[in-house]
Amino acid sequence: MTRLEGRVALVTGAGRYRGIGRAIVLRLAEEGADVVVTARARDASSFPPHEQEMGWKGIESVAEEVRGMGRRALAVDCDVTDKDDLQRTVDAAVAELGGIDILVNNAALPSEAGAAPILEMTDENWYETVDVNLHGLYHTIRAVGREMVKGGGGSIINISSTAGRIGIPNYGAYCATKWAMHGLTQQLALELARQNIRVNIVCPGSTDTDMMDGTFGRYDEVAGQEPGTSKAAIRRALLMGRQATVEEQAAVVAFLASDDSSYMTGQALNVDGGSRMD
């Protein structure tokens, strides 16, 4: 398929091998887009063992995969909480790839970061989560959105979570930022529709990623359970009997990026195997 031929996408939080961000980048490239691959730089020693063993280089490895598909790719170390970093990234995308037609806001602190009851979590954990997941979203949309207005339109896809639909005990900071994403998305849809910019959300349910494995590990640790207990229990409880794959999440993002969703804006699509039907 080449329904994104001639378009340029910018995807944040795309440096993990077993991550939704990388899967999104590869699907968009498969459908014809050139891609700006961004993430906050990580020291290789912090990579999961399987990434270290394979010589994974984060966003540069993802960009190499895109180039191997015959598409252009630009890898940019970008901290979404830093407005200067974001502007530098946008400027590089315009200079080297000609503009930005698609923005996928995938960068986020994982749900287990600072997991604690609201009355017990530290201020530092609260502010850090809000800074990355909400302020980072705000800054990224402003930097890229202004360029989209100049270019005559575009599609913005925000990656939320089922945690943006329901509260989850001990994950108040994460849930609050994802709920806020929904409000901001609807507001932007109202404000940008006449500029031919659509703004939508994908809400992944439990997905087989390193980030999700970290959440399960945190559950097991807090509960004093054997590693893997929570993951097995969730899989048994899911309606389809399994977690989503990253490719299944990426397919919905590609749909929202394309003209196949040209009359959709302000919407939130659950990709959770039927866990929530609203």
Segments and roles (model prediction):
Residues 115, 166, 236-242, 253-254, ...:
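Short C-terminal tail/terminal secondary-structure segment
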Residues 3-42:
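Canonical Rossmann dinucleotide-binding motif of NAD(H)/NADP(H)-dependent dehydrogenases/reductases
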Residues 193, 198, 264-266:
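Short, small/polar-rich loop/turn modules that mediate ligand/substrate recognition or access, typified
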Residues 141, 177, 185:
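Active-site helix of classical SDR
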